[in-house]
């Protein structure tokens, strides 16, 4: 099903949904009118790690007039989506929120309703013509052509746009996915040849993940490496980039499966800078246990080894534990260039 067909499905679903609701209201014998959405229970901290999360969908029923505020919020969101689909314009979640702040009260209300709507229809959020507000940054030798005819470059850190991309061109050999913005900014000051740098400033948003997938398709010969804190949270973020998130299980095209962990690894830190390590807490240990059970990591021996080492020594460390970080990066990329492999030890 192409993009236009998906938009037709979304439009038809919304119109039928509204029609059914109005029809129920017109029946004088009914004391209340019900609407239903498919909602998900998902673990908010482990991203894609709970393999059973996608199976725990449930239907949430809202009754009018008992849940009149929620229903009003739902129909306001549907109105915005319907307008965006008909006019073929892309709006952001924040646009919807600011159209009726008094009604929504919180941005998360809009986020949850959009997730439930797309989950109920069985489409992605982009099929609703709604994107998250820009969060991620990209830097490097890259030209991005938008569908509106604009061509943008990233010779300075560029906010990843929600506008539709028609093509991406670059001669880069490497794409570095960085967990932290501070580390990203440090690398923009270095002369890293043939390299594109991307950060989502922590846990990745959907827009940044989808941009990376488009980048991977545009640059099939480039190698994608991830740089994350040597702790369970960092590897959880790596997992979300590579395997996706339960919160957007209906967004199958946001998994960067060719992403490989560059580091830092145990030997990068503890052979030199043990004083920069921190002790694991109970939450860290619980996360490590979950990560070791995660299906995606069963075929990643390097990642499993790092997690096991964390448990064994009861320590963790941040990227900043690498004192000569720019030199370390250049050395890792040089090793990858010599080996011609997609993983570096």
UniProtKB/Swiss-Prot annotation:
A GO cellular component entry from the record: nuclear chromosome
Catalytic reaction equation(s): ATP-dependent breakage, passage and rejoining of double-stranded DNA
Binding positions for Mg(2+) per the UniProt entry: 179, 229
Single Gene Ontology MF annotation: DNA topoisomerase type II (double strand cut, ATP-hydrolyzing) activity
Cofactor(s) named in the record: Mg(2+)
Residues spanning the signal sequence: none
Highest taxon of the lineage: Eukaryota
Protein localization: Cytoplasm; Nucleus
EC number: 5.6.2.2
Annotated InterPro entries: Spo11/TopoVI_A, Spo11/TopoVI_A_N, Spo11/TopoVI_A_sf, TOPRIM_Topo6A/Spo11, WH-like_DNA-bd_sf
Active-site residues annotated for this sequence: 98 (o-(5'-phospho-dna)-tyrosine intermediate)
GO process annotations (BP): homologous chromosome orientation in meiotic metaphase I; meiotic DNA double-strand break formation; meiotic DNA double-strand break processing; reciprocal meiotic recombination
Sequence ranges assigned to domain Topo IIA-type catalytic in this UniProt record: 5-137
Assigned keywords, A-Z: Chromosome partition, Cytoplasm, DNA-binding, Isomerase, Magnesium, Meiosis, Metal-binding, Nucleus, Topoisomerase
Pfam family, one: TP6A_N
PANTHER family: MEIOTIC RECOMBINATION PROTEIN SPO11
Family: Belongs to the TOP6A family.
Function field: Required for formation of the double-strand breaks (DSBs) that initiate meiotic recombination. Required for crossover recombination and chiasmatic segregation of chromosomes during meiosis I. Also involved in the faithful equational segregation of chromosomes during meiosis II.
Subunit relationships: Component of the DSB catalytic core (DSBC) complex, composed of at least rec12, rec6 and rec14. The complex interacts with mde2.
Protein's UniProt name: Meiotic recombination protein rec12
UniProt organism field: Schizosaccharomyces pombe (strain 972 / ATCC 24843)
